[in-house]
Regions:
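Primarily recognizes Gram-negative and organellar outer-membrane beta-barrels
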Residues: 219-223, 242-251, 258-268
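Amphipathic hydrophobic-ligand
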Residues: 157-159, 250-253
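N-terminal periplasmic "start-of-domain" segments of outer-membrane beta-barrel proteins
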Residues: 7-22
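Outer-envelope exported proteins of Gram-negative bacteria
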Residues: 177, 235-237, 272-278
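Short glycine-rich beta-strand segments
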Residues: 140, 237-243, 280-284
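Gram-negative/organellar outer-membrane beta-barrel architecture
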Residues: 18, 23-226, 232-233
C-alpha cells in the first residue's frame, strides 16, 4: 500500500521497491527500497511499515507512507550593470513533472552583451529496467566588445545533445551520449591574442562544428537526493571532440561529494565536502 502521494504516481514509487510482492521477507531489501525512494528527492519523509495479515500469520503487508515536498521553481529577475545595462533572467525548473518522475527546466538570461537560452529534459525510466534518457538544447551569444579587458570579439554557440544512463548495480550507472555544437567567432580590431593566433591560421572563417562523444560513470550512495545527511556521490566523465569537427580535444572531469553528520544527535548538522577536477587536453589543431 502506498499513501501520501497526492501528486506522484504510484508507479514512480513502486519501481524503486526491491522487496517484491509474494517474495520472501528481506529486511535489507526493505531498507534499500526506502533509501531508493528517499534518494529521488521528491519527498519530505518516507516511512515503511510492516503489518501482519490476520488470516495469514506467515505473511506481512508493507505500507509505504510519503510526504511530498514542493519541487517546482520559477525564477525571474531584473538588474542594472555598468557593462551590461539591463540584465533580465528567468527560469522554470520542475522535478517530477506532473508526478511522472521526469525532470525539465528552461533558463533565459539576456543582457546587452550576453544571451543564453537553454532547455533540458530527463526521463529517469525511459525503459522499464531503469535506462534514463536526457535531451539538451541551448544557444549562447556573447559580445565582449563592451568589456575592454576581454578584447574585441563575439561568439555565437548553438548545441543539442542526447545522453543515456544504464544502471548495473543499485548504486552505479554508466553514461554515454553525443552532442553537436556549432560555434562562430567574430574577431574585431583588437581580439584576444589566443583567438587571433588560433583562429586565423587554422579556422579562416572562425567557425567550428564540434561532434562530442561522452562516456561516464557515477556512484550514488546518498540517503537523499536533495538534502543528504550521509553517503557520497561520485561521477567521472570523458568528453571527446571527434575529428568530424574542426577541433579535436578530450576533457576529463571527476566530481566527489561526501556527506557525514557532525554529531549523532543533530541530523541537520553535517559535514559536506565537494571536490571537482577538470582538465582539457588538446589533441590536434589540424
Amino acid at each position: 500500500n502506498i499513501s501520501g502521494n497526492a501528486k506522484t504516481r504510484d508507479e514512480v514509487i513502486r519501481r524503486e521497491l526491491r522487496q517484491f510482492e509474494s517474495s520472501w521477507y528481506d529486511a535489507d531489501k526493505i531498507r534499500l527500497s526506502r533509501n531508493r525512494i528517499d534518494r529521488l528527492g521528491y519527498f519530505q519523509s518516507v516511512e515503511m511499515e510492516t503489518n501482519t495479515i490476520i488470516d495469514s500469520l506467515d505473511q506481512v503487508d508493507i505500507s509505504v507512507q510519503v510526504e511530498e515536498r514542493p519541487l517546482g521553481s520559477i525564477t525571474a529577475g531584473i538588474g542594472l550593470s555598468s557593462s551590461e545595462d539591463i540584465v533580465l533572467n528567468a527560469g522554470v525548473s520542475q522535478q517530477n513533472f506532473l508526478g511522472t518522475g521526469t525532470d525539465l527546466s528552461f533558463q533565459l538570461n539576456t543582457s546587452d552583451i550576453s544571451q543564453t537560452y537553454a532547455f533540458s529534459y530527463t526521463d529517469p525510466y525511459w525503459t522499464d529496467d531503469g535506462v534514463s534518457r536526457s535531451f539538451d538544447i541551448y544557444t549562447r551569444k556573447f559580445d565582449a566588445s563592451r568589456i575592454t579587458s576581454l578584447g574585441d570579439y563575439t561568439s555565437d554557440s548553438k548545441g543539442l545533445g542526447i545522453r543515456f544512463g544504464v544502471p548495473y548495480t543499485e548504486f552505479d550507472k554508466i553514461f554515454f551520449g553525443f552532442k553537436y555544437e556549432a560555434t562562430e567567432l567574430g574577431l574585431g580590431s583588437n581580439p584576444p591574442g589566443r583567438f587571433a593566433t588560433y583562429c586565423i591560421p587554422y579556422l579562416p572563417d572562425c567557425s567550428t562544428d564540434s561532434f562530442i562523444a561522452s562516456v561516464g560513470w557515477s556512484r550514488d550512495s546518498r540517503d537523499n537526493g536533495l538534502a543528504p545527511t550521509k553517503g557520497s556521490y561520485q561521477r567521472a566523465n570523458i568528453d571527446y571532440a571527434t575529428p568530424l569537427g574542426g577541433v579535436e580535444y578530450a576533457r576529463l572531469t571527476y566530481k566527489l561529494q561526501w556527506f557525514k553528520p557532525l554529531t549523532k544527535k543533530t541530523d541537520w548538522k553535517k559535514a559536506y565536502i565537494s571536490l571537482k577536477a577538470e582538465d582539457r587536453i588538446e589533441i590536434s589543431q589540424d
